[in-house]
Regions:
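Cap/lid segment of the alpha/beta-hydrolase catalytic domain
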Residues: 162, 166-169, 173-177, 183-213, ...
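Conserved small/polar residues in nucleotide/adenosyl-binding loops
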Residues: 1-5
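N-terminal cap/lid segment of alpha/beta-hydrolase-fold proteins
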Residues: 97-150
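Alpha/beta-hydrolase fold nucleophile elbow
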Residues: 232-244
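Alpha/beta-hydrolase active-site loop
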Residues: 204-232, 248, 252, 262-277
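Short beta-strand element of the alpha/beta-hydrolase
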Residues: 151-160
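Gly/Ala-rich beta-loop-alpha elbow adjacent to hydrolase catalytic centers
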Residues: 160, 241-250
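Short beta-strand/loop motif that positions the catalytic acidic residue
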Residues: 322, 328-330
Length: 444
């Protein structure tokens, strides 16, 4: 493992070393590379700091050679455990694809795009919401139909960590045409601007307050504005939608709050550096957040989550307490929040028979993110390699839009969305599954 490659590629180098995530990684590294009287990894930390001053790349071997100790012990059992976890994750992914391809084909009719009743005229409004947890006002972008007879629920969309509103306007376009108003939240402190400042200006990496506390309070402020009629929508109903961290915030807001057992589960999860499931690094910071005891009286009409995570928060079936109809969307090429060990577990923690999981083969964690229409020029701060994007993201987004619109329409019509197995549309293999089938394909 090349540490400099990992840190430098993410643009986090020294900032990561000094962050909560860096401390966790170093603690686990010190369990494999053991230095006498250095249980907290201080010697390893200082060694990496010094090496990064001198070298462009720092490998594990570089660290071992540079540690100022005559005696170093390598825990081979721990190394084998780490390697085994990687192999197991890959094997599970390959086994899942095989099981999906062996599903009996059911329902070959995918939702059709229709120009009927499309709304062509709508308004985009940049609004500022003053909230006590923010020094500067919260910024949101509201999309509303110009027709006055629309009475659909307000959709609230939350981007993931380092995301921005522009990445998800394809969702806004699909929904506003069908009459749904949508508000996009710009979460200052964990948005694209904040991560850019970390990567390019050496600012401190955001912490748990930015990741969770302020995001939840942002959502509360938006909902309060909606209830007070500040968006000009003639109801107080809402639908929550988000990508990755944004989806987790939606679930945290609507569901049971984390318990004291979260910290214990996190200690166990870090035995393999959590590198096979990077979302664990974020989930385990939730234990630092003080959650309100009261539950929100008004509930979402639906939840839509892309590349969702939260398996450490709700590890058991039905443990989330969420009975809201939910559609989760994920891909078989997601290496950040793997389907079997992360997204499927979150899905099983939900509790509504109409819930559905859209699996798109070849789609990755980054597939919902639209940088531009062609992807030929990637000016995104993360410079995501094509090898990590997976199948054509525009097609993945178009297919996702079809199904999320159909899911929401079915809820309004009080219809249950049909299960679809082993079908193809837009050149993509996909499956729209219920919990029973998810359990079936998840079995070892």
């Amino acid at each position: 493992m090349c540490i400099r490659d990992r840190f430098k590629e993410e643009g986090l180098n020294r900032e990561v070393l000094r962050s909560w995530i860096g401390r966790k990684i170093l603690t686990e590294l010190s369990k494999t590379i053991k230095v006498p009287n250095d249980n907290n990894g201080i010697e390893i930390y200082n060694t990496i700091e010094n090496l990064l001053e001198e070298k462009k790349e720092v490998s594990t071997l570089d660290i071992i050679k540079a540690i100022p100790s005559e005696e170093i012990t390598l825990d081979l059992d721990n190394l084998i455990l780490i390697i085994s976890s990687w192999k197991n994750e890959l094997a599970m992914q390959q086994n899942l694809i095989s099981k999906l391809n062996n599903l009996e084909k059911i329902n070959d009719e995918t939702p059709k795009k229709s120009d009927d009743n499309y709304i062509s005229e709508f308004t985009k409004i940049n609004k500022k919401i003053y909230a006590s947890h923010r020094v500067k006002p919260l910024e949101v972008e509201l999309w509303k139909s110009n027709k006055t007879n629309q009475n659909k629920e307000l959709i609230i969309f939350m981007p993931g960590l380092g995301g921005e509103i522009n990445n998800f306007k394809w969702i806004g376009n699909a929904l506003i045409k069908r009459g749904w108003p949508i508000v996009f939240i710009d979460h200052r402190g964990s948005n694209l601007k904040a991560i850019t400042e970390v990567l390019e200006e050496g600012q401190s990496i955001p912490g748990s307050a930015d990741f969770f506390l302020y995001r939840i309070k942002d959502l509360e402020a938006v909902l309060k504005s909606h209830e007070n009629g500040e968006f000009g929508i003639p109801n107080n109903s809402y639908i929550l939608m988000g990508h990755s961290l944004g989806a987790l915030i939606a679930l945290l807001y609507e569901g049971n709050k984390p318990t004291v057992q979260l910290e214990e589960r996190c200690d166990s999860a870090f035995k393999d550096f959590a590198v096979t499931n990077l979302s664990k690094l974020l989930q385990c910071q939730i234990s630092e957040i003080p959650f309100s005891e009261k539950n929100n009286a008004n509930k979402a009409s639906a939840i839509i989550g892309f590349n969702t995570f939260g398996s450490l928060v709700w590890p058991k079936e039905n443990s989330s307490g969420i009975k809201t109809p939910t559609l989760l969307i994920g891909g078989t090429y997601d290496l950040i929040t793997p389907l079997i060990n992360e997204q499927f577990r979150v899905f099983s923690a939900l509790n509504n028979p109409s819930n559905r999981f859209l699996i798109i083969e070849g789609a990755s964690h980054f597939s919902p993110i639209r940088i531009n229409n062609s992807y030929e020029e990637n000016n995104d701060v993360f410079k995501i390699s094509e090898s990590f994007i997976g199948s054509n993201p525009i097609l993945v987004q178009d297919l996702s839009a079809k199904f999320l619109v159909k899911f929401l329409e079915n809820i309004r019509d009080q219809e249950v969305t049909r299960v679809i197995k082993n079908q193809k549309d837009l050149g993509l293999n996909f499956h729209l599954l219920d919990l029973e089938t998810i359990k079936e394909v998840s079995k070892n």
